[in-house]
Each structure stands twice: as C-alpha cells, then as structure tokens.
Amino acid sequence: MKKISFVILTMALVLLAASCEFENNSQYTPQIALSLPIRFCGHADTVVVKDTLGYRYDKDGKAVLDTIHVGDTVRMVVALSAQGNMLTGFHTTWDTAALQLEYLAMDSIMVALDTAKSNIAAGTLSFLPGYNMAVFPIRYIPRKSATTDITMEVQSDSKYSPTKFTIQQTAQ
C-alpha cells in the first residue's frame, strides 16, 4: 500500500510540475552596462594622454561626464543583457552635428545582427532571435563646443522592455 501511495504521489507531483507555465517566469528588464569612459587626447604639440573620465548622476538619472575638449576621443565598451529573455534591438541617438559616434569592432557581433534591419552608422542594431547578450566598443569625438546627450535604448522580448540610459557630455 505504501508503494502505491508513493507512486500516486510521485505521478501527481510530476503532473503538477508539467502543467506549470515556466516561460512567463523569465520577464527581466534588459540591462545596459558601460565600462569606464577612457579619454584619449592628442594635439599637434603634445603627446597623447589617456585618462579615465569621472562622472556623476544628475537628478534625472543621466550620467554626466567630465568636460572634455573638442577633438578628444572617448572610448567605452557597451554590454547589453536580456538575462532570461532575448535581445531584439538597440538604438543610440545623439546630436550628429556636435558628436561623431561610431560602433567599433562590430565583426564580433555581426552573426547576431539582422543586417537587413540594422543601420550601424545611424546607431540602430536589430538582433536575430536567440541572442541574450552583446558586447561591443563605441567611440565618440566632439566636433564642436556643446553639451550633448547620448541616449542608448535596449529592447528585448520582455514585457519590461525597453531600458534607456543617457550620457551627457560637455565639450569645450
């Protein structure tokens, strides 16, 4: 009798577990992570200097970076994560008159991109199904004295998508 009760209890637990809907448990907010911004400044009369830019967050949640000079180059690595979900897109907006911004070393993630829908030069990446993480470097160079926002937005198939992150850069 104990064996029959054990078998029935085990079958009931298996049936209960099989009827659960596990797919809806993976609803995570997609994340954007950035390495510390590195500034490279090189002028005709000086040696190239490399340093890490400091930053603080303002009341609106923008990362406000230290002031740099027109012509300095800032590089950082962008990491996108959808955790238990899949990436669907990434978009960067910036003032093209004030900044020259480019994605670098894209060969490493080209296999994950839907090239028909992506426009790398315009800051739009569209991901193929099945990818939940992407890492790539970006670089920007201020073209004129201005305070400029660089807004990054990552989308995933999560109901908590998208996520936005803004960097504010002042150049003199």
What does each of the following model-derived ranges do?
Residues 130, 141-147:
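Surface-exposed, short loops/turns at beta-strand junctions within beta-sandwich domains
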Residues 1-21:
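Sec-dependent bacterial lipoprotein signal peptides
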Residues 14-44:
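Bacterial Sec-dependent N-terminal signal peptides
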Residues 45-46, 51-52, 61, 66-67, ...:
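Coil residues (strongly favoring Ser/Thr
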Residues 116-137:
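Aromatic sugar-binding surface patches on proteins
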Residues 74, 146-152:
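Exposed beta-strand face motif in extracellular beta-rich ectodomains
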Residues 74-84, 138-140:
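Aromatic/hydrophobic beta-strand junction motif of beta-rich domains
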Residues 161-172:
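C-terminal edge beta-strand
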